[in-house]
Amino acid sequence: MLFITFRLGGERYALEAERIVEVLPLVDLQTVLRPPPGIAGTLNYHGEFVPVLDLSQMILGRPAPPRLSTRLIVARVNDDQGFRLLGIIAENVTETMRCDANDFVSPGIVSGEAPFLGTVHVGERGLVQRVDVDRLLTSRQRDFVFEPPAAA
């Protein structure tokens, strides 16, 4: 299985490559008024407005620095309405990693503050924690960025 890796602070994280639509350079976003914490704005992605989440803001409490290695990852998120696009700002998006999904093991501690942080892979280069894109958004963020289904 292929993963794209990134760093936040000194820690390494991984996203499943099959969920990634495209990796873009950091671009200017459309700002939104009074967003929940972590929501950076919206991206006009081929005519579709895609909400963007800043992982540095969510995990480290500060926005991602505007560096060459800071990228905007467009990913497919699965929810009760099917797949939707979500932009994810991540730091040090420079590598991929190939391993079996079964090589990831429980870290032994589950954070209620970060339910999107999943299992851990221990490799030659240290620990890599898997990020579950379907659990990235809190219910408040999800309600803010995705329109509810139309009433029948």
Where would I find each of the regions flagged by the language model?
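An acidic, low-aromatic, low-complexity terminal/linker signal
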Residues: 1-152
